[in-house]
UniProtKB/Swiss-Prot annotation:
The lectin-like LINK domain is responsible for hyaluronan binding. It comes from Canis lupus familiaris. Hyaluronan binds at R34, R71, Y72, Y98. Lymph nodes. Phosphorylated; activation of PKC results in the dephosphorylation of Ser-320 (constitutive phosphorylation site), and the phosphorylation of Ser-286. This is CD44 antigen. The keyword Ribosomal protein does not apply.
Length: 351
């Protein structure tokens, strides 16, 4: 139980922040290896990094210099995934800045640092410059694996500090898993100004470009991010299929939604498991003590007084013993009687 309480305190007093490289000032932040950042906490976290939530234009600029993830995160006004290469398990196989219309409230976040270099910057971040005093141990985990810890706090909303809503137990950054909902998706797709793959896409998607001259091309052909322009597509229903590309047809889907497991339930289950283990150990120990065999000591009473004490314990057992006596019955006629009878018969025969 003491170990369980210790683990509970540690889980509540420590935050791990996994961050990526900066691309045109934009970077991704993940808390404690799962979707666990609210929109208010996202703004506070970016502020602690001396940054802000990026706008759509800033996210598109980051995409153009090579920024992509497989994790939903907050930007200004949206929840998005930036994708350059299509992947059936990331952003439903779409590319561009993929917008999610969600019915849940906790994801990762993206931040924008205006003082970062205009291209890619993978310099390690060592601290939260705008964090204030607090009891929480905040650990920054950079992409190269370096870790830097400090005591402090960055959240200002009491609901973010002591959440009452459960969070999704998801996987770490860059994983193939992502969140899927029953709501529709809006797509901010990017493409070449004079070409767009109209025939290879689903019929529900609407395409447009500056020339209004769509040219059919293979879906697998690559488009350099720097040559892309911003295009808005209509809402699309979140289907559930395998995302195959056979014969030029492209069927996409969102992954299965993971069940929501609150942190307090995980901690409670750990404590109950620990208590159960302790109870089993106590029961086994008690059974061993109660199950010890008692030795039966039989004394014939010839020893000293002290030696005869055990025989008193077994007195009842000795009283229950039965003595069996064998009694030899004598025959009704003695040998002398047999001899007299024989002589009488002999005399009668002589006469």
């Amino acid at each position: 139980l003491a170990w369980g309480l210790c683990l509970l305190r540690l889980s509540l007093a420590q935050i791990d922040l996994n961050i990526t490289c900066r691309y045109a000032g934009v970077f991704h932040v993940e808390k404690n290896g799962r979707y666990s950042i609210s929109r208010t906490a996202a703004a506070d976290l970016c502020k602690a990094f001396n940054s802000t939530l990026p706008t759509m234009a800033q996210m598109e600029r980051a995409l153009s210099v090579g920024f992509e993830t497989c994790r939903y995160g907050f930007i200004e006004g949206h929840v998005v995934i930036p994708r350059i290469q299509p992947n059936a398990i990331c952003a439903a196989n779409h590319t561009g800045v993929y917008i999610l219309i969600s019915n849940t409230s906790q994801y990762d976040t993206y931040c924008f640092n205006a003082s970062a270099p205009p291209e890619e910057d993978c310099t390690s971040v060592t601290h939260l410059p705008n964090a204030f005093d607090g009891p929480i141990t905040i650990t920054i985990v950079n992409r190269d694996g370096t870790r830097y810890s400090q005591k402090g706090e960055y959240r200002t909303n009491p609901e973010d500090i002591n959440p009452s809503n459960p969070t999704d137990d998801d996987v770490s950054s860059g994983s193939s898993s992502e969140r899927s909902t029953s709501a529709g998706y809006n797509i901010f797709h990017t493409h070449l100004p004079t070409a767009y793959p109209t025939e290879d896409q689903d019929s529900s998607r609407v395409s447009s470009n500056s020339d209004h001259t769509p040219i059919t091309k293979d879906h697998d052909s690559s488009v350099h991010p720097s040559e892309r322009s911003h295009t808005t597509h209509g809402s699309e229903s979140a289907g559930h299929s395998s995302g195959s590309q056979e014969g030029g047809a492209n069927t996409t889907s969102g992954p299965m939604r993971k069940p929501q497991i609150p942190e307090w339930l995980i901690i409670l289950a750990s404590l109950l498991a620990l208590a159960l283990i302790l109870a089993v150990c106590i029961a086994v120990n008690s059974r061993r003590r109660c199950g010890q065999k008692k030795k039966l000591v039989i004394n014939n009473g010839n020893g000293a007084v002290g030696d005869r004490k055990p025989s008193g314990i077994n007195g009842e057992a000795s009283k229950s013993q039965e003595m069996v006596h064998l009694v030899n019955k004598e025959p009704s006629e003695t040998p002398d009687q047999y001899t007299t009878a024989d002589e009488t018969r002999n005399l009668q025969n002589v006469d």
